[in-house]
From Swiss-Prot:
Pfam families: Ribosomal_L30. GO terms for molecular function: structural constituent of ribosome. Keywords: Ribonucleoprotein, Ribosomal protein. Belongs to the universal ribosomal protein uL30 family. Part of the 50S ribosomal subunit. One of its GO terms (cellular component) is cytosolic large ribosomal subunit. This is Large ribosomal subunit protein uL30. It comes from the Bacteria. One of its GO terms (biological process) is translation. It comes from Oenococcus oeni (strain ATCC BAA-331 / PSU-1).
């Protein structure tokens, strides 16, 4: 099973509070910061809510 590399490409400043909370819950604080998370339904659901702020790529283990 693959992992997902999630990179914040747009700032969370002046975004709705819920979008900021979601980005911080993923561990994304600054623009161009990246995290690796497992590819599952929960992670995909979180990404869907802030898809306009992040870039996602699949990474093999």
């Amino acid at each position: 099973m693959a992992d997902l590399k999630i990179t914040l490409i747009k700032s969370i400043v002046h975004r709705e509070p819920r979008q900021r909370e979601i980005a911080k819950s993923l561990g994304l604080g600054r623009v161009h910061s990246s995290v690796v998370r497992p590819d599952n339904a929960a992670t995909r659901g979180i990404i869907f809510k802030i898809a306009h702020l992040v870039s996602v790529e699949e990474v093999n283990k």
